[in-house]
């Protein structure tokens, strides 16, 4: 009998699916021990299931320990209630144990993350192997993918005492097993919320320290290969994650993390370090033995420099030259030598074709990470049979492939010369292709992956009725197989079923910035739409019929509300929908579509579906890390008498820099003015020339302009040149505590380091009032000149009634309708995996219905509100509107929380309401607030939506303010700023 423990507590409705996935296994001789508390939401589900299936035994008062003690089966596994067991899993696993007699079997698993499924494999299949022979099985073993003798689960790591987490118990099973099987069959799927991965450094660093210490102690009596495997595959990655949290944690926990590292890590002379990459070795040594300054330097460099390591060929072999080693002390030389783990051969196959029936022509790229392709030999490609025999061997010809730099993400090396072409006789039977490259008397090998694009086969020409086909196998590797005589040519995969298909055959960008797609369809008699779909929004266009069965559609990429990033390409008709399939001409490497407003990249997935990435209009070289690094290092020439302006790192055409730009142009500035934009959808102030962030003209303007004006930080690499002047306008009077004043852990290490470099480079800081000056200087550690005065951006509030009604007309709001502007600040807790989130603690739909007002929702760019779910015309998403000042003029009342917009809107004299339902959490935990906010503020504070609705009804019933703004303070401050800029341009010392 097989016993399956299912941990249902906290899984909610997912628990039923987990239990049913066990009951539906073809292996019928099993019992389910469902661990669930009587008060848990899943208890009722478990009771109902148990009433209909006697194989289920609820364990109402206990935990996994108690359930294992109750198990009647000789074999056991543990399933989390969030997860599911895949069909046929237990038959495959028990069958393997019957054949081998091993104590445990480990299968492959699949992580169902927000970014899509990710397969977690054992290294390869093994039968009755000892753990020291297969230490790679310690790479994050998943409980539900491990089936073992029940006694192993009962005694796993028992000597350590205390409660045991699921990953700890699972590793204990592997350590206790005499022999193990491993399968490449997927047997288990787990998702966010599951207990199988164990505690995370982000959510519970102390628990992860506990786990690491216990695993380290448990492994102390094991053989060196097992201890090394545990360090490489489990403890090392856990300690790296803890190291990344160290600067954000309270001192007591940070010290605990360092002690944990010291207790686990071996001496520098130990060979156990050899399985880790160089920068991980350096980080962990510094964590255990270095100072805080060096630890922060190493952690910061992993983001600022990347985790790529430049390698050069020296007299004694390869030498690692990561720049961070020049900035820290005390790392033993044994840890900085090049190990096998530091040498990774990367291979990409762009396309395959045939020269006759037997010769396969392969085009792709192959390079060793960190090594200049000029320092290596040409790739050697071998066809290898199932028995390991080499069937053919050819030296490839090198060619250029600029795409390799984009894929590599390496700032220190170019792999543009790593392309190859080779023609290899494939032999008669099944074969795989293997690449090898030599460098410094070392040979590195790897199997060639399947070609880019879908998993369709590429058949050879027929000779005497015999053909062969190149295709991707189940592991994503390139293989060649014989086709039986008369076998039909394999069709492209289709996720849409046999009746409805929309096939993409052409793609391009129009001059106007529209993505023009064309193709053919089958099984669709009526019309249909093409859609770009992502978690952040969708773009829709009707497919226009052309000739019979063909269509064309233009998707507008120029709307500022269309976020950049990846989208799936789908079709939708009145009664059906599905994923678009790529046609043969687009099935392969990514198709680059260059535009002037935005660019796009079309990608074919393995299942034949298509994705589109919407990007800034940059070249492939400008998008690559190497290309950017070369632009950073390039000499851009002497300074130019000109002004470079940027708002929110190029995302905006507004705020203080835009008002300063407009003022300079209106007063006839006789110097070039450059405006930084993320892409061509960002509005550019009149009189300025747009430069796209990351482009060569942008680098040149930023590096050569005499005056730089920004309201945010500049890139991390930026360093002001002699003679340049930098005006920091900032972007609001601070309410949220900033930088050095913020709560511990609220500000990332990378941002702290960036600001520590950039704040001393400011020549003038703007502050809206004296309190803002004090808080900004305190938070930033700034000691330079400060100009106190009304913000330039509030020149946008001088438009009065004319602009008010103009904006209302643009938004479709009647002139006399009451209008509420809801403009909350951002919250870290709302950020999802894609950077988006719900973005609101307010039910805008209910607010509009209960107040009779139109609600304008202005979400922060860090927490985009998902407007497609509002379902009411009275709620309008204005997050993408270019000028918040226009929205303030259009509104009768402002609702906000901890946003500096209150100090701007207050100039209109109209009502403001502070809505802070999460005040304690935000003020005391997440961020911290200045000056007794919001209780000490001049505006009413409400904590619930019902209170808010009552206050707003009263405010809207009162006579409306004219909203006129005194122009003098704004214009006077603009004049002072203009004089400062002109003096700076003319080489005078600004006043």
Language model features: what each stretch is:
Residues 617-629, 733-834, 861, 961:
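A nucleotide-sugar donor-handling region in carbohydrate enzymes
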